[in-house]
């Protein structure tokens, strides 16, 4: 038995889960929020009960030390020596990393080099890695990249039709995100379908406040909706998804905004929030739409319509599809969105059961048994993928 910590460090937060492997039992989980403030919030789950403490946590290193001390004081571990490995979520691995990797000084340097591709996320991920290195210097640590799974995309999928030297000089290409989630749910789908993943053509719909679709053929990502950044693809909670690039100078001209200000609008004030004018939260929009709010209904239709189109295009790309998977907050819980997305896909062999579609937050087939294309709801589990990669790469167990 080994104990593995899965870590997701944000600029002012630190999410954690402690697994016992190989059983994949979650021993505890929690989050440190508002790091850098006097009223930081430390939340940990012990024996199913959430315990919360508000205290000053000046930086990530202090948050890590506090986390480890709490694991001991709550009797979850007896000493730091019981931690056998640590897995860190890293948002962007660029082209350098096509798999998770053991963290060395050289690897850390390479993660820093690709940070300009994810300036909001990678620096925070690096801070988390260094904080753990300070407190647990001899424990093997693994970086698990959101982008790595999509590194199997062929050139015709990842290249933009721009001057080729923009790719060779500046690394401008599609990278894709949510890779750890897409990998988990497609592997799990193969298990539930009882077929080798090498034989399957799968479309994975990771639908949360950020959303992306992936075409996965033979267990490998061959295309995905997000691009150079997570702004591309389908409309999302606050992100626009794909737009005509000529709109950016046009909006600048009409509003007097700078390029950065327009980008801020595209990232934070667009998507379902922009169309509805009321919220980026799907639950609010479903409620408002049910009460007759036309723009809330329109926001839901636009969101579903874009996903629907990606499913059709990826089915064409793979010359057919064996299963469609819904995952993440919206994908796992919203029967309304799933119904809107699946509506009209009977022409390609998708027959789904409205009664089965009422499922929320648990694994289920929502297609009829006779449906040639199966439809599954699979709750994602990025943390367990991180723990598995630590065991695999650090030769633990």
UniProtKB/Swiss-Prot annotation:
Instruction: List, alphabetically, the InterPro entries matched.
Output: Ac/propionate_kinase, Aliphatic_acid_kin_short-chain, Aliphatic_acid_kinase_CS, ATPase_NBD
Question: Where along the chain is Mg(2+) bound?
Answer: 8, 382
- What Gene3D superfamilies has UniProt attached to this entry? 3.30.420.40
Q: Which reaction does it catalyse?
A: acetate + ATP = acetyl phosphate + ADP
Q: Where in the cell is it found?
A: Cytoplasm
Residues annotated as the enzyme's active site: 146
Q: One Pfam family name from the record? A: Acetate_kinase
Write down the position(s) of the site called Transition state stabilizer: 178, 239
> Which GO annotations describe the biological process of this protein?
acetate metabolic process; acetyl-CoA biosynthetic process
Q: What does this protein do?
A: Catalyzes the formation of acetyl phosphate from acetate and ATP. Can also catalyze the reverse reaction.
| Annotated PANTHER family | ACETATE KINASE (PTHR21060), ACETATE KINASE-RELATED (PTHR21060:SF15)
> Under which name does UniProt file this protein?
Acetate kinase
What gene is this protein translated from? ackA
């Amino acid at each position: 038995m080994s104990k593995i910590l899965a870590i997701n460090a944000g600029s002012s937060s630190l999410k954690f889960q402690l697994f016992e492997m190989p059983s994949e039992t979650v021993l505890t989980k929690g989050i440190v929020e508002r790091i850098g403030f006097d009223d930081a919030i430390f939340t940990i789950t012990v024996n199913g009960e959430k315990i919360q403490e508000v205290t000053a946590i000046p930086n990530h290193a202090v948050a890590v030390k506090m986390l480890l001390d709490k694991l001991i004081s709550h009797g979850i571990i007896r000493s730091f020596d019981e931690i056998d490995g640590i897995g860190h979520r890293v948002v962007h691995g660029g082209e350098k990393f096509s798999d998770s990797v053991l963290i060395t000084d050289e690897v850390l340097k390479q993660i820093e080099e690709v940070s300009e591709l994810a300036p909001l996320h990678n620096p925070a991920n690096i801070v988390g890695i260094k904080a753990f290195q300070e407190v647990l210097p001899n424990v093997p640590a693994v970086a698990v990249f959101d982008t790595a799974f999509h590194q199997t995309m062929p050139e015709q999928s990842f290249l933009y039709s721009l001057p080729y030297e923009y790719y060779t000089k500046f690394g401008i290409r599609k990278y894709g995100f949510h890779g750890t989630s897409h990998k988990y749910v497609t592997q799990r789908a193969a298990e539930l379908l009882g077929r080798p993943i090498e034989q399957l053509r799968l479309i994975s719909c990771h639908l949360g406040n950020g959303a992306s679709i992936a075409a996965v053929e033979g267990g490998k990502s061959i295309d995905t909706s997000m691009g150079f950044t997570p702004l591309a693809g389908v409309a999302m909670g606050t992100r626009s998804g794909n737009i005509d690039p000529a709109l950016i100078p046009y909006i600048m001209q009409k509003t007097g905004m700078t390029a950065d200000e327009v980008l801020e609008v595209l990232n934070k004030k667009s998507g379902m929030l922009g169309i509805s004018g009321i919220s980026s939260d799907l639950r609010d929009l479903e409620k408002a739409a049910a009460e007759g709010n036309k723009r809330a209904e329109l926001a839901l239709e636009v969101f579903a319509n874009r996903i629907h189109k990606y499913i059709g295009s990826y089915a064409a790309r793979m010359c057919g599809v064996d299963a469609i998977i819904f995952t993440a907050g919206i994908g796992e819980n919203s029967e309304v969105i799933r119904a809107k997305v699946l509506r009209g896909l009977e022409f390609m062999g998708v027959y789904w059961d409205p009664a089965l579609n009422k499922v929320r937050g648990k694994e289920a087939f929502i297609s009829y048994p006779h449906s040639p294309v199966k439809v599954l709801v699979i709750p994602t589990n990025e943390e367990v993928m991180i723990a598995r990669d630590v065991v695999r790469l650090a030769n633990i167990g």
